[in-house]
From Swiss-Prot:
The keyword ATP-binding applies. One of its GO terms (cellular component) is plasma membrane. InterPro entries: ATPase_P-typ_cation-transptr_N, ATPase_P-typ_cyto_dom_N, ATPase_P-typ_P_site, ATPase_P-typ_TM_dom_sf, ATPase_P-typ_transduc_dom_A_sf, HAD-like_sf, HAD_sf, P-type_ATPase_IIIA. Gene3D superfamilies: 6.10.140.890, Calcium-transporting ATPase, cytoplasmic domain N, Calcium-transporting ATPase, cytoplasmic transduction domain A, Calcium-transporting ATPase, transmembrane domain, HAD superfamily/HAD-like. This is ATPase 4, plasma membrane-type. Residues 1-69, 123-251, 300-651, 702-717, 785-796, 847-960 are cytoplasmic. One of its GO terms (biological process) is response to salt stress. The modification Phosphoserine is found at residue 942. Belongs to the cation transport ATPase (P-type) (TC 3.A.3) family. Type IIIA subfamily.
Length: 960
């Protein structure tokens, strides 16, 4: 016994060292070398092998936490602060004064605080993400202890027997056992664009995707020993710079350039023109460097996104890519699967409506044949509905011997079972899409019209059709062609809409998100479902728009516009989904796409936000950006709202950061150059530390999500920041002038004068300027965070408490601090009250400035000017050219298109204009509803006339 165990271990160690070529030896030798059988491993044997071979996952590079911490100090914004620290001790050593150690220590402290917060939050976010992704860890169907079960793919070991089916990502390198050939997509590994066919005995690689078929396989390699694992060792991963990082860089560069311009002007004016002393000049440059850099920006934005990602996961949307949050906030088109997302995917069959085509057969026999062509295990919704109609699910296989089952695949769109009955005769039954089954039928030409009539009748009631066919197989083999196919019957399938779908679609349209239904069903079903859901019914078969046989009635119209204006697409194939997304993106839409199957992967990858719905295949999950853990459309709309709230916080902060940079650079530059006022750099450092501490709480601020799709508009951020910053800089300059050059405040409020009493004595004035700048700078966040009046939208409790504490500290410093090293002196409570009053008065116009900026940037102001000019012109010729255009215009209107001369979305830059598409979708839905009511009214009136009733009396009691 001991010898056998040792022999097994020696053989397995040889496999581990790759001394045996398990990819090429006959399959029998694979079992021999792996000391396993087709009955699978026992749990004990699997545990022993797991200890030997390790987990079935790639080794993760362990990053030094200390180096990661230092990495947060290695970015352009940090470099500027580090340069300021060096200036404080190297260049500031002159003018009879020692090096500026307090500023040096303060700058380093600020850097360490920001890096520590970033490090802790990213670490927490990383741990949370790892826990969430563990829920999405790939699963594998494995045979252990003689029973099939679903296990984490990470515990697979060589020798395990696994099952691979359509949509699965192959969990480990394996050799296929007996069964039908598989279609495997190896493009991610080998670059082969077309799926390859793999038969019994062939090897399949970990990471490839099953596109068709179902088969069992024996695992021959796991983890780093797989083909994928070896390739991953050879390829060094590269970090792609995302859009979010580009935005951060652009804002950082703007702030750095603003500071550089301010410093250059100061250097040119102070030294060659004003002949200022060396040391005060360096101090003034330090003020711009320290105060102007938004050093907390990367920390605030990453913390905001990490907290937001956690909130999304609580709502049932796990973000695989953090920056998908900003794209979700800007999404204006959502292409949603009908089945399972808009509907319940709980199919029911009405036996009374079954249409029988084969003589001698009743509805019960049609159901039994359909049940035979269904899987009893791993059922999809259709199989479950049909087998569930039987009195006992076992009846589906009662009295027959299964020879071969052909699983569903997207190409054939049908399943089939070859079986032997009690008398030893072989038969085959198939169920699937009516068109596919009809093509099999030997008498297609005779029954085609009736079949289509029944399908249309079902479709008008929102019912899908499922066809059933039957044939004898005299040869008795699974691969025999068999005799002529008999078209047995058509079954109606009803998939009821989700109870919340109609309300969710209405919410989406109100949020500026146009929902487009994507369905593989025929057009009539799509329109009927759309009607029930309160959508418009402006839908097209996707093949009529994108296929080879385009509809003649719309062939002359622009396909891109038709897609843009459509409420849905029917008869959709996977390649059509990709094309729809591509064309919507070409028209400047941020497009979301839901999907669940392996064939949805290309479209999910192409979409700006790929959303894998609940119960999606591994392939769909791996291609998506967001994975839903709850079914339905409402989860997506909730995620959109949350994403917009997260994005709003980030946008509010960036406007605030740019404004502060401009106000510090412009304000202190003017004070230094006009009045030769030298503000102490240490006090700017105190402002920065208090500001950064307060602003961290914006990540949990209470905000109203944008009512429209939102995105980074850098020109808007910079323009708003420059206007706000310039206004606040002027506030400081005016305050300085009134305090220093006039006796207005002492005369009005009875406070002491702040005029300097000795040469270079600006100590009390410095305290006053410090408090004025500190209060209004932090108060600006309340203006940038609100869409309406800042005093109406209540901020989050954390932000409010942080602001009060920070400004209490700032006020106490200004009132009491007598710091010789910082060159400030306490000004008393009287001046503190004056400064608070001054800031409150000048705070009020900030809201008006915000409204004016928004109005000016929207283009409305300039549109009005243009419209007034156009109003005085008139069109003289309404002749021939106009009449020629009328027919084309009528055709476009019929299909919901705008006039050809109207600017389309490609030319539009403002979100409110893009939102017109959602508004038009709402209008179409309303028109469809009114049309239905009008039809109903006409029907009622005709019945009333037929019955000879008094219509006037009825109309007084009821209105439509």
């Amino acid at each position: 016994m001991t010898t056998t165990v040792e022999d097994n271990r020696e053989v397995l160690e040889a496999v581990l060292k790759e001394a045996v070529d398990l990819e090429n030896v006959p399959i029998e030798e694979v079992f021999e070398n792996l000391r396993c059988s087709k009955e699978g491993l026992t749990t004990q044997a699997a545990d022993e092998r797991l200890a030997l071979f390790g987990h079935n996952k790639l080794e993760e590079k362990k990053e030094s936490k200390f180096l990661k911490f230092l990495g947060f100090m290695w970015n352009p914004l940090s470099w500027v602060m580090e340069a300021a620290a060096i200036m404080a001790i190297a260049l500031a050593n002159g003018g009879g004064k020692p090096p500026d150690w307090q500023d040096f220590v303060g700058i380093i402290t600020l850097l360490v605080i920001n890096s520590t917060i970033s490090f802790i939050e990213e670490n927490n976010a990383g741990n949370a993400a790892a826990a969430l992704m563990a829920r999405l860890a790939p699963k594998a169907k494995v045979l252990r202890d003689g029973r099939w079960g679903e296990q984490d793919a990470a515990i697979l070991v060589p020798g395990d027997i696994i099952s691979i089916k359509l949509g699965d990502i192959v969990p480990a390198d394996a050799r296929l056992l007996e069964g039908d050939p598989l279609k495997i997509d190896q493009s991610a590994l080998t670059g082969e664009s077309l799926p390859v066919t793999k038969s019994s005995g062939d090897g399949v690689y970990s990471g490839s995707t099953c596109k068709q078929g179902e088969i069992e396989a024996v695992v021959i390699a796991t983890g780093v020993h797989t083909f994928f694992g070896k390739a991953a060792h050879l390829v060094d991963t590269t970090n792609q710079i995302g859009h979010f990082q580009q935005v951060l860089t652009a804002i950082g560069n703007f702030c750095i350039c603003s500071i550089a311009v301010g410093m250059l002007i100061e250097i040119v004016v102070m030294y060659p023109i004003q002949h200022r002393a060396y040391r005060p000049g360096i101090d003034n440059l330090l003020v711009l460097l320290i105060g102007g850099i938004p050093i907390a920006m990367p920390t605030v934005l990453s913390v905001t996104m990490a907290i937001g990602s956690h909130r999304l996961s609580q709502q049932g949307a796990i973000t695989k890519r953090m920056t998908a949050i900003e794209e979700m906030a800007g999404m204006d088109v959502l292409c949603s699967d009908k089945t399972g997302t808009l509907t319940l995917n709980k199919l029911t069959v009405d036996k009374n409506l079954i249409e029988v085509f084969m003589k001698g057969v009743d509805a019960d026999t049609v159901v039994l044949m359909a049940a035979r062509a269904s899987r009893l295990e791993n059922q999809d919704a259709i199989d479950a509905a049909i087998v569930g109609m039987l009195a006992d699910p076992k009846d589906a296989r009662a009295g027959i011997q299964e020879v071969h089952f052909l699983p569903f695949n997207p190409t054939d769109k049908r399943t089939a079972l070859t079986y032997i009955d009690n008398e030893g005769n072989t038969h085959r039954v198939s169920k699937g899409a009516p068109e596919q089954i009809l093509n099999l039928a030997h008498n297609k030409s005779e029954i085609e019209r009736r079949v289509h009539a029944v399908i249309d009748k079902f479709a008008e009631r929102g019912l899908r059709s499922l066809a059933v066919a039957y044939q004898d197989v005299p040869e008795g083999r699974k691969d025999s062609a068999g005799g002529p196919w008999q078209f047995v019957g058509l079954m109606p399938l009803f998939d009821p809409p989700r109870h919340d779908s109609a309300e969710t679609i209405r919410r989406a349209l109100n949020l500026g998100v146009s929902v487009k239904m994507i369905t593989g069903d025929q057009l009539a079903i799509g329109k009927e479902t759309g009607r029930r859901l309160g959508m418009g019914t402006n839908m097209y078969p996707s093949s009529a728009l994108l296929g080879q046989n385009k509809d003649e009635s719309i062939v002359a119209l622009p396909v891109d516009e038709l897609i843009e204006k459509a409420d849905g697409f029917a008869g959709v194939f996977p390649e059509h989904k990709y094309e729809i997304v591509k064309r919507l993106q070409a028209r400047k839409h941020i497009c979301g796409m839901t999907g669940d199957g392996v064939n949805d992967a290309p479209a999910l990858k192409k979409a700006d936000i790929g959303i894998a719905v609940a119960d999606a295949t591994d392939a769909a999950r791996s291609a998506s950006d967001i994975v839903l853990t709850e079914p339905g459309l409402s989860v997506i709309i909730s995620a959109v709202l949350t994403s917009r709230a997260i994005f709003q916080r980030m946008k509010n902060y960036t406007i605030y950061a740019v404004s502060i940079t401009i106000r510090i650079v412009l304000g202190f530059m003017l004070l230094a150059l006009i009045w030769q006022f030298d503000f102490p750099p240490f006090m700017v450092l105190i402002i920065a530390i208090l500001n950064d501490g307060t602003i961290m709480t914006i990540s949990k601020d209470r905000v109203k999500p944008s009512p429209l799709p939102d995105s980074w508009k850098l020109s808007e951020i910079f323009a708003t920041g420059v206007v706000f910053g310039s206004y606040m800089a002027m506030m400081t300059v005016i305050f300085f002038w009134v305090s220093y050059k006039t006796d207005f405040f002492p005369r009005t409020f009875g406070v002491a004068t702040l005029e300097k009493t000795a040469h270079d004595d600006f100590r009390k004035l410095a305290s006053a300027i410090y408090l004025q700048v500190s209060i209004i700078s932090q108060a600006l966040i309340f203006v940038t965070r609100s869409r309406s009046w800042s005093f109406v939208e209540r901020p989050g409790i954390f932000l409010m408490i942080a602001f009060i504490l920070a400004q209490l500290v700032a006020t106490l410093i200004a009132v009491y601090a007598n710091w010789s090293f910082a060159a400030i002196e306490g000004i008393g409570w009287g001046w503190a009250g004056v400064i608070w009053l001054y800031n409150i008065i000048f705070y009020i116009p900030l809201d008006f400035i915000k409204f004016f900026i928004r109005y000016a940037l929207s283009g409305r102001a300039w549109d009005l000017v243009i419209e007034q000019r156009v109003a005085f012109t008139r069109q003289k010729d309404f002749g021939k050219e106009q009449r020629e255009l009328q027919w084309a215009h009528a055709q476009r209107t019929l299909h919901g298109l705008q006039a050809p001369d109207t600017k389309m979305f490609t030319d539009r830059t403002h979100v409110s204009e893009l939102n017109q598409m959602a508004e038009e979708a709402k209008r179409r839905a309303e028109i469809a509803r009114l049309r239905e009511l009008h039809t109903l009214k006409g029907h009622v009136e005709s019945v009333v006339r037929l019955k000879g009733l008094d219509i006037e009396t009825i109309q007084q009691a009821y209105t439509v």
